Amino acid sequence: MKYYIIAGEASGDMHASNLVAEIKKKDKKAEFRGCGGDLMKAQGVDLLKHYRTMAYMGFVEVAVNLRKVLDSIAQCKKDIVDYQPDVVILVDYPGFNFRIADFAHEKGFKVFYYISPQVWAWKRRRVRKIQKSVDKMLVILPFEEEFYKRYGVDVTYVGHPLLDELAKFGNGNRSMFLRRNSLGEKREIIALLPGSRKQEVKRMLPVMLKVTSHFPEYQFVVAGVSSLEKSLYKGIMGKADVFLVENQTYELLQNSSAALVTSGTATLETALFSVPEVVCYKATGFSYHLAKWMIKVKFISLVNLIMDKEVVKELIQGDLTEDNLVKELNQLLHDGNRQRQMLEDYEDLQDRLGNAGASEKAASVIIESLKLKK
């Protein structure tokens, strides 16, 4: 069968590539085309566009680059019609993928959505559009299945694909990691995860770097991603006493005592590595106020949303200050009770998420559903 798959950012590329790998095991004649990143390409997906040319963060950035976004959508629509896939698989990335879902449905293509947009947090009216244009939702958070069922959407909870990644990762060698990155053996590490998009890094990393001088006994290490130029990080870091590692986020977390993490998938990754964290988020003023007006949930981090309580501290917008970061990081490093409670909550979080196997289950659901509908 022919599969058209679209992911618009780094985490989506990772999850989509794992899904492709599992589909190939079950469908030996599978062919793939779509939009995504290096990991999808490595699995044999013929890319129309790389997500680097598509990823914009927040209302303002999207508005400024609206022409580019609309051009990408138009190119993608044409490519789907030319390719004539058996199914269109959309991975998160709602601003782009909702438009593709509507189009693909109208043209008679089967549409599967893997990794739900956070419509339960805002824009709940979008659920009605999902009900009309998506044949099957494959969700990765425990509470999402019940949410969609309330609206009559065909939905299956497949588990969280991050558990698949962690199962593959295993235990790294600390000494090798330290030597490879010229890190000291004696000083504990604090990880800085500023995000995977250029706009995020430019906004978040300068704020995170302000805390480094308050903790001279620790070594701060920035998690760089392959989709961004090394010069971007180096330009922001300047002469600060901070290290940069590239494409080694899991090894970094495995060897860290605490982390400052930009809100997103990385907050859950950090928790699954049992690293105490502070969640950070800052948008442009307009984007933030618009989001605040629209958002319907109490928390922004996946950890707190899944647990339905504040497990990790969220420093958002005006609260994301040097003083607050120093205060929270101090507690994570030196308050034993705070550390123990957070780690206990992390264990409960893992219990709620269940076991690995999301990619395999999602692939099975897709292939079986297509067989039934043929």
Residue ranges and their predicted role:
Residues M1-K374:
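Nucleotide-activated sugar donor-binding and catalytic core shared by glycosyltransferases
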